[in-house]
Structures are given as C-alpha cells and as structure tokens.
C-alpha cells in the first residue's frame, strides 16, 4: 500500500510502498479516506531536535484521520464493517494506575500513532478498537479528519468554567483558533487571541473571535480597556509555548485566574514567579484528549452549531502531499487535508 514515511534521518517525507498492517484480535483495520497534517508532522518533516530523539526511522507518520472500518479483530465488539471512524492517537497500556482509575489520558506508558508506531498517512491503518471513535452521520469527513487537534483545543478550552468569563488565548495556530472558537461558543464573554502572524489572526476573525490582536502592532492593555475589562483575564489558554506570550499572559491575568497550558515552552524558560504566587494563579498542564469524554464533547459542539469550516484552508490529493507540507511550513495556512480516495 502507499504510505508517507520518514525514511532518512534528514529533512523530508517520502512516498513509499509498505505492507498492509496485520490485524490483531482486538484491532480494527481502517481504510483511510482523509488525513490532516499536524504541527508534529512538520517537526518530523523538518527533523528537528525533538524528532531526532523521538522518531525511529523508517516510520509511517501521521495521526489525524478519518476512514472506514474494513476489518475487525475476532475479539472486537461494537463495530461493523463500513463504520466511519476517527481515533485516539495515544495508545495506552490499560494496566497502570491512571488507566485503571479512569484517567486514561494520563497513562505513563502512552505510545503515539505515527510517532512510536506506524501512523495514518497510509491507505490502511490498524489501531486497537478501544481507540476508535464512530463519527456521527451529520459530521463531514473533513471535520472528522481534524478531530485529533480539535480535541486538543476542546480539552484545553473546557478545562475551566468559561461562562461569562474573559478569556485570553495566546497563539493563533489552528488549535489556538479552535480553542478560542470553543470558548466563545460555550458562553465566554470576551475571547481575545494574540499572535504576530496576520494570516492566522484573520482566520481567527473569520471564526467570530471577539478580538484578534497582533501584539507587534497593538498593546494588549489597550485592547482590554477597549473591551471594558478592568481586572484582567479570568482564564488563559497558552497554546504555542512561547515565553514572551506566556509572560504577557501572567501580566494580564486577574487574581485567582486559571491557565491551561498546551504549548511546550523551552526547558529553560524563566518567568516572574511572584505573579503566579501573589495573584494566586492556577496552572494546569494539558496533554492530548480526555478519553473519551473529549471526543463526545467534540461531536456535540459541532452538532450544536460550532462552525470549524474556516480553519480548513487547503485540500490536496495524497499524490500532492509535498504541496500540503509546503503550505503548512509556510505559516500561511490553517489545517491542510490530504485525500486518499
């Protein structure tokens, strides 16, 4: 079968021919319809420091997808041939304390699809049936293919009660924009998103965010005054792991504010800890998606009218995958979808 693989320890992704994966007793075989390119896939393409430490070569990459069940392991129940599914990209052990205690997303033995085991940039994918999520009929393939990153956004945004709150989102990448849209959809008062990339800030404006602020051109304190905010932001969603953005967030949070951190900052990032302490801030680290509460919330949000369609900006055939990676690497894109049909 055709697959996109990391073949060499250097920049690039290559189209390859690999065997169809074998179906285990507890697995599903999925025929891939559409995949989306994640920022993680771009890191792997660029072969940065994280990729060099993490990715075994060769490796079929990718973890954002929608497809059709074409094979069912003999121990599997609850699925039928033809079911349309996406799936949780974190394969968990099932026997550690967190898994057994119902906190599966915190499994200490997590293995990543397309990172530590073969991924979805292929005609077929095998995953444990436990990880598969049936897609409702009224959700399109395009939207289903981005459920993985949408789940990061939903997990981050819904970490705290947002109704009537003022929310600051740092970083207008696709996940940041989706998180901001979720916050607005569920009842936040003001949702402000910051970045220096005007293309992506314009995407945020199309999603109905209260204010999309280019911090290279506007002062965030002036924006807060314009919105009638006198005490700071109640909730902060930190998406890019950018030290200057996080410091600005600490400066503008209200006392008792809550921050959810999805972004991964440099290990040597310095901040003014007195602001965390004297403001009584609560900081929560976010990893992946809650299994599987986040997945049900994703479907419900879309079914209740949340429109994510503007975030999908580019679509290519899998044979034009290079154009897709070029678009993602340019910074002038939202989500990029590759069709395998």
Swiss-Prot record:
Q: In which pathway does it act?
A: Amino-acid degradation; L-threonine degradation via oxydo-reductase pathway; glycine from L-threonine: step 1/2
Which residues are Zn(2+) 1-binding?
38, 63-64
Cofactors named for this entry: Zn(2+)
Q: Name one GO molecular function term.
A: zinc ion binding
**Which annotated residues bind NAD(+)?**
175, 195, 200, 262-264, 286-287
Reactions listed under catalytic activity: L-threonine + NAD(+) = (2S)-2-amino-3-oxobutanoate + NADH + H(+)
Indicate which residues the UniProt annotation says bind Zn(2+) 2.
93, 96, 99, 107
Q: EC number(s) in its UniProt entry? A: 1.1.1.103
- Where is this protein localized, as stated in its record? Cytoplasm
List, from the UniProt record, the residues annotated as the active site of this protein: 40 (charge relay system), 43 (charge relay system)
Q: Which parts of the sequence are marked as the site Important for catalytic activity for the proton relay mechanism but does not participate directly in the coordination of zinc atom?
A: 148
Q: Which SMART domains match?
A: PKS_ER
| Keywords of the record | Cytoplasm, Metal-binding, NAD, Oxidoreductase, Zinc
Q: Which GO terms describe its biological process?
A: L-threonine catabolic process to glycine
Q: Name one GO cellular component term.
A: cytoplasm
PROSITE patterns reported in the protein's UniProt record: ADH_ZINC
Assembly and partners are described as:
Homotetramer.
- What is the role of this chain? Catalyzes the NAD(+)-dependent oxidation of L-threonine to 2-amino-3-ketobutyrate.
Write out the similarity annotation. Answer: Belongs to the zinc-containing alcohol dehydrogenase family.
Its protein name is: L-threonine 3-dehydrogenase
**Organism source for this protein?**
Escherichia coli O139:H28 (strain E24377A / ETEC)
Gene this chain is encoded by: tdh
